[in-house]
Amino acid sequence: MKLSRRDFMKANAVAAAAAAAGLTIPTVARAVTDAGSDGITWDKAPCRFCGTGCGVLVGTQNGRIVASQGDPDAPVNRGLNCIKGYFLPKIMYGKDRLTQPLLRMKGGQYDKEGEFTPVSWDQAFDVMAAKFKGTLKEKGPGAVGMFGSGQWTVWEGYAAAKLFKAGFRSNNLDPNARHCMASAVVGFMRTFGMDEPMGCYDDIEQADAFVLWGSNMAEMHPILWSRITNRRLSNDKVQVAVLSTFEQRSFELADNPIIFTPQSDLVILNYIANYIIQNNAVDQAFMDKHVNIRKGATDIGYGLRPTDPLEKAAKNPGSDASEPMSFDDYKAFVADYTLEKTAKMTGVPQDQLLALAKLYADPNIKVVSYWTMGFNQHTRGVWANNLCYNIHLLTGKISKPGCGPFSLTGQPSACGTAREVGTFAHRLPADMVVTNEKHRQIAETRWKIPAGTIPDKVGLHAVAQDRALKDGKLNAYWVMCNNNMQAGPNINADRMPGWRDPRNFIVVSDPYPTVSALSADLILPTAMWVEKEGAYGNAERRTQFWHQQVKAPGEAKSDLWQLMEFSKRFTVDEVWPAALLAKMPALQGKTLYEVLYVNGNVDRYPLDEVPADRLNDEARACGFYVQKGLFEEYAGFGRGHGHDLAPFDAYHKARGIRWPVVDGKETLWRYREGYDPFVKNGEEVRFYGKPDGKAVIFALPYEPPAESPDQEYDLWLSTGRVLEHWHTGSMTRRVPELHRAFPEAVLFIHPLDAKARGLRRGDKVKVMSRRGELVSIVETRGRNRVPQGLVYMPFFDAAQLVNVLTLDATDPLSKEADFKKCAVKIEKV
């Protein structure tokens, strides 16, 4: 089926309207999915794309996926998919799908400068194991590392965490969720002592107002946006406010569309807190019972190398310190953020700021705040999260139907795998951390490994991994289920030089020859989505399972198979010091596979528990139900203290279940009596992630970005996504309809900025920052209408690597890069 761009956009509009009206799948979608054809077998799965967690029905025939449609029984999307979801089958069958391992070779041997040559899995793992063993022997665990994914299944991430943190004794494991959700994680932990939202999508149908902070839900979370649209259009009292540094699709529904100067969201948040206090809108009873106030450290730097002038100038680089503060002192602190000052610093008219503050302050208006990368990809992203929580805590508009702060995720299992499993460099499962001795002991006991196996120091985060690769300190490196060479910041500074450094051996596991894969030394072909059994955890704490439905092409293998098979190449004697092994001499001579995955926990469920009519390549390769074993071992970390997951088998029968799950019942609103089983009768609200059960309001000021426009580099650059493509486009650009709809990246620029530079729509233009340059196409119209002084460019296009321009400044607390703010200049080509 062929769609013009006009038809494509019309189809998406139809989809949104259908959702708002409660209709079934639009005609164009039925044509694409070929629903109802004879001989098609249907089964459920969560969508492969964003963190919304939509349910789809996958149609298979003769060993191939031939159709998909929205699952009418899925509570998230109620039968509707966005335009990407309708084309899911086609992401599996790109013409350049990888089907066998490829190793750089010259003269029949591995060579860093050689050509990619097909090899067997044994050959691939022989070379790879030799490189990892050599590095471990010569330099130790700190020289090996892995960059994983929020697209991993739950058990893939868990298996990876065990292999690196226990097997190789290296905490140098970090997910690409570092680039998108790390600020949200640290924000949750600082304020509440536990990660992830307290609310759920059911808030949408009960809220009176929605405030979007740096979130273009209309394009990035279109199914949730359709539910908000339905709520707004069916009740004229419902209001929508959208805050962004440029006008985008979500503005079409906004009652209060706000464009602010980059970084000044911090000012707006403090102004709202000030307004609430000055107008006696504080829920004082809630504050007295459930909230503490602390003053946070300031001037904390920008996460750059210690030699950078900005880091040298910082008074408290990387500091997470805070001290108790009285309410009166907090009141005085935010009093500086007046309406007049805020309007001047942000460029937002006073009447719009006042209207926004009144939404939050009115005790009769239930408000949900949503945010994504505008908050998180921010050099003060953690602070932005904390300041938003302040507003909800001051007003008591939290942890109850229709009220709450909600961080939306961009990947299908950034929550379920990266965060809950603990595949960050500092984390273990269920919000535990490697720096806590008790937490390490819990993990070591559950994993049946010697005390002291897991290192007590935080490993290298994403940007630090890039720097260590360039510096020759990280030498054996495995990248799995992501395209970080294209997606990460400041490509030319550290990452590309590090990957191509002859001291380093780089492995990439991927279904397609991405920019990352083609920059590596060894490419391992990977099974995708329903070519394996899997589990994802979405943004509302909903865990969803699916069965394997087709086989992967050629010799492609799942990430789980790759991790476990690779572990067979190492004995504990080769990777653990003798003193450690002496604590458990019975483990001597065993492989990491035997110690980590055949430990009496993971292998406890026999193969006959896999339904005979179901595909499950990994289980049959292992000889036991490996997914169930991994999941149940992992779930044991969280049960009993607010991270409770249901039994494995329950998920295959359900359309997802939201944790904590106690006595078979899911939890919709956490921390609230009557909804959360961990809040006792009479407590009303208890933020039990904190020892005293109280959340924390943080006093945090505005601080400037790491880089701003000047006379030479006179424009802000912001990067992001578009509706048609997901992240780096490695899947969506292989769908002809999606590719044709948005074939290449463009540079969105204000018409007056273009005119001042002698540019017209469609002109080729060179975009330059202090770090790199590229050529793009001028776009002065369309969906993104940027203000003067700012340009916007999506990052899906491998031919226009926008991240050669971006700065690798990070939030010093979360280590998440700021992709939304750097300075560029442009000139006509």
UniProtKB/Swiss-Prot annotation:
Changes after translation: Predicted to be exported by the Tat system. The position of the signal peptide cleavage has not been experimentally proven.
Cofactor: binding details: Binds 1 [4Fe-4S] cluster.
Domain 4Fe-4S Mo/W bis-MGD-type: 40-96
Keywords tagged on the record: 4Fe-4S, Electron transport, Iron, Iron-sulfur, Metal-binding, Molybdenum, Nitrate assimilation, Oxidoreductase, Periplasm, Signal, Transport
Signal sequence region: 1-31
GO biological process terms held by the UniProt record: cellular respiration; Mo-molybdopterin cofactor biosynthetic process; nitrate assimilation
Reaction(s) catalysed by this chain's protein: 2 Fe(II)-[cytochrome] + nitrate + 2 H(+) = 2 Fe(III)-[cytochrome] + nitrite + H2O
Amino acids binding substrate: 795
Binding site for Mo-bis(molybdopterin guanine dinucleotide): 84, 151, 176, 180, 213-220, 263-265, 373, 377, 483, 509-510, 532, 559, 719-728, 803, 820
Keyword Methyltransferase (UniProt): no
Gene3D superfamilies for the chain: 2.40.40.20, 3.30.200.210, 3.40.50.740, Dimethylsulfoxide Reductase, domain 2 (3.40.228.10)
Enzyme class, broadest EC rank: oxidoreductase
Cellular compartment(s): Periplasm
Family designation: Belongs to the prokaryotic molybdopterin-containing oxidoreductase family. NasA/NapA/NarB subfamily.
HAMAP family in alphabetical order: Nitrate_reduct_NapA
Name assigned to this protein: Periplasmic nitrate reductase
Organism this protein belongs to: Edwardsiella ictaluri (strain 93-146)
